[in-house]
Amino acid sequence: MESTLGAGIVIAEALQNQLAWLENVWLWITFLGDPKILFLFYFPAAYYASRRVGIAVLWISLITEWLNLIFKWFLFGDRPFWWVHESGYYSQAPAQVHQFPSSCETGPGSPSGHCMITGAALWPIMTALSSQVATRARSRWVRVMPSLAYCTFLLAVGLSRIFILAHFPHQVLAGLITGAVLGWLMTPRVPMERELSFYGLTALALMLGTSLIYWTLFTLGLDLSWSISLAFKWCERPEWIHVDSRPFASLSRDSGAALGLGIALHSPCYAQVRRAQLGNGQKIACLVLAMGLLGPLDWLGHPPQISLFYIFNFLKYTLWPCLVLALVPWAVHMFSAQEAPPIHSS
């Protein structure tokens, strides 16, 4: 395994030295591949284009992110930014690599969450676009464009994770394969508009299941905070370590989103706009308004105490689906109805 990890450092070193001029591009790509962006941008954008696809993106994101957390606890993968120091291989001749503000994630490294979660969650978008293109284009090359864009983007995300020393190549490959398989398996099986208890029990199962696994491993003598200690030890700047990269931050996001999805689907606002046919202008207005609400909503997720952060993060991602699915479309629909001119009979 050490030889595999050493080869990964060589690849990261080559990327940083040969493609240093693309640094801002790699940082932007790793931002676009962040699982948080799936919840905060890809989900509303997909939802306002297609209700079914948007719900699929949110559901697959929260389930896959939870699975990624469990996989990481069992696989104990190192991250390059600390392994290059901990291994001792480079004490005589230090590797010519450096960290970035997004390098210092605190969870274990295998498999890559960016690749696995994003790969799975973007699968329904890719298949929906492929179906649309297939009905309108005769050229075979045009028909494969959505699949090609999907693969190209995920490959770029994987390379960006290697570039910033967040993952080794084999962790990226594992994430890409696992994400594509999960996306393929889950897309046809996404629950649509189930009873509220289903979503509440899903959120409860995510929290209780994680707690059971955590305390079982802890009882067996496994220290699941080992990666947090290494991240604090070897990160070049303390301000680069963000609390939302901790494992339980993703759990609060996933369980909150599951509960919020159920509340949104059973809200009076959603019932009013469920069968309304919003025009393209109204859909764009919904997306712009939802993105505008991100600022005050994001403020909820950053209290100084770690326990309060988890609580507020849960509430934030519970509220977000309610805004996207119900409150924002309802507000736009009602405003548009008031602005529409009255119809006079002849």
From Swiss-Prot:
Catalytic activity: D-glucose 6-phosphate + H2O = D-glucose + phosphate
Keywords: Disease variant, Endoplasmic reticulum, Gluconeogenesis, Hydrolase, Membrane, Transmembrane, Transmembrane helix
Coiled coil: none
Tissue specificity field: Ubiquitously expressed. Highly expressed in skeletal muscle, at intermediate levels in heart, brain, placenta, kidney, colon, thymus, spleen and pancreas. Also detected in testis, prostate, ovary, liver, lung, small intestine and peripheral blood lymphocytes.
Protein localization: Endoplasmic reticulum membrane
Listed GO MF terms: glucose-6-phosphatase activity
Binding site for substrate: 79, 161
GO cellular component: endoplasmic reticulum; endoplasmic reticulum membrane; membrane
Activity regulation text: Inhibited by vanadate.
Record field: transmembrane: 25-45, 55-75, 115-135, 147-164, 170-186, 198-218, 255-273, 284-304, 308-328
Pathway entry: Carbohydrate biosynthesis; gluconeogenesis
Pfam families recorded: PAP2 (PF01569)
Effect of residue 154 to P: In SCN4; complete loss of activity
GO BP terms: gluconeogenesis; glucose 6-phosphate metabolic process; glucose-6-phosphate transport
Function: Hydrolyzes glucose-6-phosphate to glucose in the endoplasmic reticulum. May form with the glucose-6-phosphate transporter (SLC37A4/G6PT) a ubiquitously expressed complex responsible for glucose production through glycogenolysis and gluconeogenesis. Probably required for normal neutrophil function.
Protein known as: Glucose-6-phosphatase 3
